[in-house]
Amino acid sequence: MRKASQNPLQGQVAIVTGAGRGIGSAIARELAGLGAVTVLCGRGSKLLEETAKLIADSGGQAKVVACDVTDLSSVESVAARVKRDFGRADILVNNAGIGSFASPLHQLPPDSWEKVMNTNLRGVYYCIRSFAPMMIDARSGHIVNISSLAGKNALPNGAVYSASKWGLNGLSYSVAEELRSHNIRVSVICPGSVHTKLSPHEGKDPQKMLQPEDVAHVVAMLVTQAPQSFVSEVLLRPTLKP
């Protein structure tokens, strides 16, 4: 039986995108609590600093780095900084995402389509493209993509969000096969309704929805899995139907 450790991620570096609030903040705090140095990426420096303070107050380590995942040069700059400062990238959590749930597809403005796809899909591609080489060189690493059950089901008035998450699931499965020979694990989490500002939860009981911490616990489970195996996909649902 594998011995449990209080700090199983001690010495590891975890990059979390969209770490300023909601699911991303919860994931960053969870990984820091397990001993990882967390690199907090996002566009809102104030929110990132708030997450960093929560981590520091709990005895963890965090570094705030401004990053726009839709801008390749911005992501590459963060990867270069991580390599310079730490020399490694053990965990990459692609969490940054936006939604659009206000109209059917035929009424959706083209710029709304572009914004969602650029963040939810192109941004993940940019991050994997920038950080995977470090993992390949180290022959070790774990990439966790935060998708959605909307990437498994139809979502009326949310077609672009659903399409971006279906695409993210396909990307995740393919990259998992591409990187397995390099000893790199790729997992995708598909949560149901999570009580965050992104989720369209009007009329739903928050007590019956997933909380950001629920997703964070799953990330922790994945990245502390014994190295000879990995969980490729997790479908996460609230126990009680909202």
Residue positions per predicted region:
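Conserved glycine-rich cofactor-binding loop
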Residues: 13, 20-22
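Conserved glycine-rich Rossmann-like NAD(P)H-binding loop of the short-chain dehydrogenase/reductase
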Residues: 34-50
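The beta1-alpha1 cofactor-binding region of Rossmann-like NAD(H)/NADP(H)-dependent oxidoreductases
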Residues: 66-78, 110
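Substrate-binding pocket helix/loop in short-chain dehydrogenase/reductase
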Residues: 103-105, 112-114
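Active-site helix of classical SDR
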Residues: 128, 164
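Residue(s) in the substrate-gating loop at a strand-loop-helix junction
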Residues: 148
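C-terminal helical subdomain
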Residues: 181-184, 188-189, 204-242
